[in-house]
Amino acid sequence: MRFADTNVLLYAISRDPAEQDKAKRANDILAGRDLALSVQVLQELYVQATRASRPDALSHRQAVLLIESFRRFPVQDLTTGIMMAALDARQRFQLPYWDAAIIEAARAMGCTDVLSEDLSDSQDYGGVRVVNPFR
């Protein structure tokens, strides 16, 4: 199973003409069935998608409906176990905490790949590998 980072979801809803290739790729990814998310990813999506400075900002209601639609995928809750593993991974791999939390949520879901444009492509974090799907 693959784990999608927030940027995959954000590209899927982008109306920016400069991001249309990435939007198509993101929607192709979301059409698959082998995908997992986390509560953190959905929270970040809400914050970024409704940001007033975003040219194509969603309303609260639109964002809630979008998040509900993404619940068709398995979603990893944030637990104290994941938080503690992320704190460990932060130290071990010298990652920002929020990136480590993504890696550890993916691991908890049994994912071997994290689809992300924000983390280092091809980097392996103890059996969880980052893949940039937009390269």
Predicted features and spans:
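Acidic, PIN/NYN-like endoribonuclease modules and their adjacent C-terminal/linker elements
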Residues: 1, 103-135
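Short, well-structured N-terminal submotif of metal-dependent ribonuclease cores
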Residues: 1-37, 52-61, 65
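Short amphipathic alpha-helical interaction patches enriched in hydrophobic/aromatic residues
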Residues: 10-14, 49-53, 71-74, 90
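Substrate-recognition element of Asp-dependent hydrolases with the DxDx(T/V) motif
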Residues: 37-40, 116
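Short, conserved alpha-helical segments within structured domains
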Residues: 41-42, 62, 82, 102
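Active-site neighborhoods of divalent-metal-dependent phosphate/nucleic-acid chemistry enzymes
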Residues: 72-114
